């Protein structure tokens, strides 16, 4: 299985320097520290997905760097949204939703006023625009929406679906992708005069690449899980040997045999383990192995389901 760099780590100086971002993004990193933990993590995830989408789309390194920073700043306007709305545990009322939508224009104004943020205003301003004209804040059409915003929109929608917000129910990866794919199809709510009756909200080409990015992420998770399962298998084999020696020790009647098997048991036990709590240790290892095997099966099935999706 190919090696995959899964996460764009904004706090790893080595990784930042490889993209020449260590100086340009340090200011933005400090600025977003003021956001609540969910929004900050969401911005990081959207930036990571955006970076990977740009790679899949074979965009230039310069544009990828620019687009990644735009994505990281896309929700910067939420600095000005009341926490009572931003962190509300229940679904927003229509009035609250209208206030929440203002984060796009608020983010735009913040970026325009700040010379260090100004180059990246497009992420904040346009990431909720839709190709069919049903987005906000301006209701722009396909050709008027910057390409970076089209990419960020898809990344933002995916992360918002798979990572549970306070007022939303978590859904699975495949179901999230189905929703995003559905949003590539024409909407009944699209303005009739737009001339884009065949366009959906999302760019099909970008959504196709999203499927590839998600599969890469799952394959990375599989590779990590396989390593852990292999370690568990080795440990269970060790524990099986201990169990065999314990059984033989318990069935032995001669003192020398009891001592002999006891010595082998002591050699196989790890620091912190003892023969007295062996049953619990053995059971916990078996349970962990079964759990990880089930996770692996689920991940493999997830990839199969994603590959069956059609755009």
Where are these regions (language model features)?
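Histidine- and acidic-residue-rich, metal-dependent catalytic cores
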Residues: 2-310
């Amino acid at each position: 299985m190919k090696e995959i760099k899964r996460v764009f780590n904004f706090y790893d100086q080595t990784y930042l320097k490889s993209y020449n971002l260590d100086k340009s993004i340090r200011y933005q990193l400090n600025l977003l520290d003021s956001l609540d933990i969910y929004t900050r993590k969401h911005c990081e995830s959207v930036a990571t997905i955006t970076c990977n989408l740009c790679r899949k789309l074979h965009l230039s390194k310069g544009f990828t760097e620019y687009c990644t920073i735009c994505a990281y700043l896309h929700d910067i306007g939420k600095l000005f949204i009341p926490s009572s709305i931003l962190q509300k545990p229940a679904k927003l009322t229509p009035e609250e939703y209208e206030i929440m939508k203002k984060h796009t224009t608020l983010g735009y104004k913040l970026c325009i006023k700040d010379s260090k943020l100004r180059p990246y205003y497009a992420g904040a301003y346009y990431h909720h625009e839709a190709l069919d004209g049903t987005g906000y804040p301006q209701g722009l059409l396909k050709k008027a929406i910057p390409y970076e915003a089209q990419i960020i929109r898809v990344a933002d929608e995916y992360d918002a679906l798979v990572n549970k917000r306070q007022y939303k129910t978590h859904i699975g990866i495949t179901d999230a992708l189905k929703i995003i794919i559905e949003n590539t199809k024409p909407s009944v709510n699209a303005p009739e005069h737009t001339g884009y009756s065949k366009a959906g909200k999302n760019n099909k080409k970008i959504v196709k690449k999203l499927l590839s990015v998600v599969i890469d992420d799952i394959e990375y998770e599989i590779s990590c899980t396989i390593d852990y399962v292999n370690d568990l298998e080795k440990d269970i084999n060790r524990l099986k040997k201990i169990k065999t020696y314990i059984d033989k020790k318990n069935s032995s009647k001669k003192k020398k045999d009891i001592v002999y098997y006891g010595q082998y048991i002591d050699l196989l036990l790890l620091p912190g383990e003892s023969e007295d709590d062996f049953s619990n240790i053995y059971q916990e290892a078996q349970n962990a192995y079964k759990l990880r095997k089930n996770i692996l099966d689920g991940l493999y099935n997830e990839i199969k389901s994603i590959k069956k999706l059609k755009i």
